[in-house]
Amino acid sequence: DPESLRQDHEFLLGDRILSCPVTEEKADVGRTDMSQARSTWRVYLPPGTWYHHWSGTKYAGGAYHEVPAPPGSLPLFMREGLIIPTYDRAVDTFVEGVEDPAIKDMEQVDGSIEVLFHGYGEDRFTLWDGTTIHCVRRPGEAGTYTVENGHGRSYTCVFVN
């Protein structure tokens, strides 16, 4: 998509996640008076269907949209029908074997993975260790998922929208 190439403030992470950081004045960086801070941001979404990660709002791609961008928030979009594997949101460090009980390390969170699947479609994703996750969701049906070679982890799948 030629229009996508013109966007200097958007970053596609693989084919699944689009990050659109606020890069203009009135952003909240270093601001103490938030009354003048930006609350929306104009983004271009590549062709396809996208979901705003924080609100779950569905957007048509191939177009510009004014999206929520409250102070302290990053406009982040997930492509419809693709698997997004995530670790526990409470991880403090990706280093294993940390001896401080107050710090949740990689070894502790590696026991479970949450899979996000936005909208409808079918996708198969292989993790770094050979685990394969397969998700399917059709309109009017509940989503299903399977995990092959799960390496003793627990897996949950959250079907969004």
List each model region and its residues.
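Catalytic core of carbohydrate-active enzymes
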Residues: 1-154, 159
